[in-house]
Structure formats: structure tokens, C-alpha cells
A protein has these predicted regions:
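Positively charged n-region of N-terminal signal peptides that target proteins for export
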Residues: 1-4
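Bacterial signal peptide processing site
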Residues: 18-21
Length: 325
């Protein structure tokens, strides 16, 4: 569930939006391959530079002094839930994405929140997978990764009424995957936190093909604070309570948490949560871990994640929290 609340006062100095950068194709980027690849493999390539917050090892970072209070506000006894898998309610379960090449035509797109969106056109295929299915409700994310230009195009509440000749969405954001640039301060994205969605997904190609996730993940909580902390750029709450997590808060699985008894593929996810953690990225059910759908997932294996409870996490120390008025 996504709620858009625009801060009343934006920071005076805005950082450049990722959509305005052009870093070209980084060395080692995977070949574009077929014209479009729904939920395709990146063959080990990692979005964003090595020093990007998404790619930073926080296993030894300090614990936030308010960690216990913040985790209690989310739910200490609630289990981690895989918000992805094979099929749910007749549609692929998770947030899908599609890989495209430079040959993919760009099409016009309009937005409900155009003042906080990167303008089109976007290279969205006519048959791009939509979260929840073409006729589904919900967040309806459409994520497109241009492998040749190494750019990410993300939309929320996306739809097309003319077979893909043009699209309409709640908002849209473009990220240069060779840059560390953030959204302008106070801006949303296709995510309530103003973050990119794709880098935080649990993906089949990493878990099974690569056997390693080398970046942070994303999750949702039911109640967030009217505040955000970098790399997030936007809040989506009217509640200023310091007991609630701000958007962008990062948690990690405690180093002492025993994971040896979990299925091997689940252990890949849990190791990433120890080393890179996960960001509060949206409002929704608490401790719901985001991922991409794939018919090859073993839903029974993924269900084992529920054995990890909120009390098994700790909040990574935060600084520079931006609070709403």
C-alpha cells in the first residue's frame, strides 16, 4: 500500500536526480541480449557504484541508540515475510521488471505527480510486466532496465489504454546506474521513500544462479514516521512519533542469528541481510521483504523466512534524519 504525502518545505539545496546523469555503460556490464527479457538475469552485474549506499557493507556499522524502540514499533514477534514467489491470486507474485536494449523505442508517458517525476519518454515495451498483472490493482509498478545505457526507469500505478503506444502512471523516476546521484530532496519516486525499487529486490538470478546477493534489500512497515534519512528522499506519513521508523531506515540481521538450519537459497538471502541489511522503502505490511516473481522459485523454501523475527534485527545508526514540520 502506497500513500504519497508531499513535504511542505523542500530542502533549499537539491541533489541532482539520477535521471539527469549519463554515465554510459560500465565495464563488465552484461550484454543486452534479446530485445526484452522479463525478470532476466544481470549475470552478476550490480547496479550503482561500489561505494553507493545500496552496495555498502554495514555488518560492522554501529547500532542506532533507539534501535530497540524502533523495532518494537514495527513488531518484535512478527516474522519476515517473502512478498514474492511464483504465483499469488492468479498473478506473478512480486514486483516484476524487464531488461531492454538500446533498440527499445521510447514512448510518451504522463504522471499524476509530474512535478516530482522525471519526464518521458520511457523505453517501456508494450508487453512490459505490471505488478499484480495487467488487470490487477495494487501498486502496479513497472520497472525497465536499459542494459546498454545502464539506466533504470521506474513507474508506480502504471497503465496503458492503447496497447503500449503511451503510458500513464502516478509517478516516475529515472536512475543512472553508474552514478551515486539521489533524487532531489523531498521528491518521491516509484517508491514512497524516493528510492529506486529494483536494486532492493530479491531476484532469482542472484539467489540461485549467482548464489550471492551483494546489495541491500527493501521491505515495508505498516506505520512510518513523517521523516526520511538518506538515501531516502521522501516521507509518506503524517505521524511525527520518534518511535516510528523514518523512510530509509536500515536494519540488519544480527550477526549471532543462526541460519545454518535454513534452506540453502534462503541462507543466501539471510547472509545478505547480515552484510547489507534492508531499507524501509514503503508503507505496507510489516516485515514484508520485496522480491521479483519467478516461476522457478520454491515457495515452500521461501516460506521458511518467517522463522526470522523482528527481534532478530537491529537498526543501523542513523544521522541527518529529515523530519517534517
Amino acid at each position: 500500500m502506497r500513500t504519497l504525502l508531499i513535504p511542505a518545505v523542500l530542502l533549499a539545496l537539491l541533489m541532482a536526480c539520477g535521471g539527469g546523469q549519463s554515465g554510459g555503460v560500465p565495464a563488465g556490464a552484461p550484454p543486452s541480449g534479446p530485445a526484452t527479457q522479463p525478470n532476466g538475469s544481470l549475470h552478476g552485474r550490480r547496479p550503482f557504484p561500489a561505494d553507493n549506499p545500496w552496495n555498502t557493507d554495514i555488518s560492522s556499522a554501529a547500532v542506532d541508540p533507539d534501535s530497540a524502540t524502533l523495532l518494537a514499533g514495527i513488531g518484535l514477534g512478527t516474522g519476515l515475510h517473502p512478498d514474492f514467489g511464483t504465483v499469488w491470486a492468479g498473478a506473478p507474485n512480486g514486483i516484476p521488471y524487464v531488461l531492454v536494449s538500446a533498440a527499445q523505442p521510447k514512448v510518451p508517458i504522463s504522471f499524476d505527480y509530474a512535478d516530482e517525476s522525471d519526464p518521458g519518454p520511457y523505453p517501456i515495451p508494450a508487453d512490459a510486466p505490471v505488478e499484480g498483472g495487467a488487470a490487477g490493482s495494487g501498486d502496479r509498478h513497472v520497472l525497465v532496465l536499459d542494459l546498454d545505457h545502464w539506466k533504470l526507469y521506474e513507474t508506480w500505478n502504471a497503465s496503458t489504454a492503447n496497447g503500449g503506444a503511451s503510458w500513464h502512471a502516478g509517478s516516475g523516476a529515472v536512475f543512472d546506474l553508474g552514478s551515486d546521484a539521489l533524487r532531489p530532496a523531498g521528491w518521491t519516486s516509484a517508491d514512497a521513500a524516493g528510492l529506486p525499487v529494483f536494486p532492493g529486490l530479491v531476484r532469482y538470478d542472484e539467489v540461485v544462479e549467482q548464489g550471492s546477493i551483494q546489495h541491500a534489500l527493501r521491505f515495508t512497515v505498516q506505520h512510518t514516521r513523517k521523516a526520511y534519512v538518506a538515501p531516502a528522499r521522501h516521507w509518506a506519513s503524517a505521524d511525527p512519533s520518534p518511535a516510528l521508523p523514518p523512510m530509509g531506515m536500515r536494519v540488519r540481521l544480527k550477526a549471532a542469528t543462526a541460519i545454518g538450519g535454513y534452506p540453502a537459497h534462503v541462507q543466501v538471502i539471510l547472509r545478505a541481510l547480515k552484510q547489507y541489511g534492508m531499507f524501509v522503502a514503503d508503507n505496507g505490511s510489516s516485515w514484508y521483504l520485496s522480491g521479483a516473481p519467478d516461476a522457478r522459485w520454491d515457495d515452500g523454501e521461501l516460506a521458511a523466512l518467517v522463522g526470522i523475527k523482528g527481534s532478530d534485527f537491529e537498526v543501523v545508526a542513523m544521522s541527518g534524519v529529515v523530519a517534517g514540520p
